[in-house]
């Protein structure tokens, strides 16, 4: 199934400053950014992967895959998935497209911390790329406005 980038972006813009009641809000449990990114990806793909432990799915707050809400877990799922559901590759920032995910690391003491969704890829530079996100709720926020030390652009392939 082809990834519907327009649907992912439309979802991101609709829910950037709100919470879809169909999904739990993880803001008080470590952050909601990857939950929001997963919702956007799902809006664009329409397919979940129900493989226990290593899949990517959300049924309820207590019945979800770690990849649905974890930054590094989402990365591992998207870049290694060979079954149902979305896939991605790490790419150069200049190749990023609307509906892709850009993961950010804010400190040497942590792994990657944040998973904003690209709503406008611009010309592929941090000043022109605009993202939507939860935890640090935003829509059309310039990527360059984040203070990150490392970046991981994930381009959706399916």
Question: Can you name each region flagged by the protein language model?
Answer:
Residues 1-69:
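N-terminal capping segments
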Residues 17, 41-42, 107, 121, ...:
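Residue-level marker of positions within ordered structural domains that often coincide
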Residues 52, 104-107, 133-136:
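Active-site-proximal beta-strand/loop segments in catalytic clefts of secreted hydrolases
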Residues 58-130:
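...with weaker cross-activation on analogous glycine-rich loops/strands in unrelated enzymes
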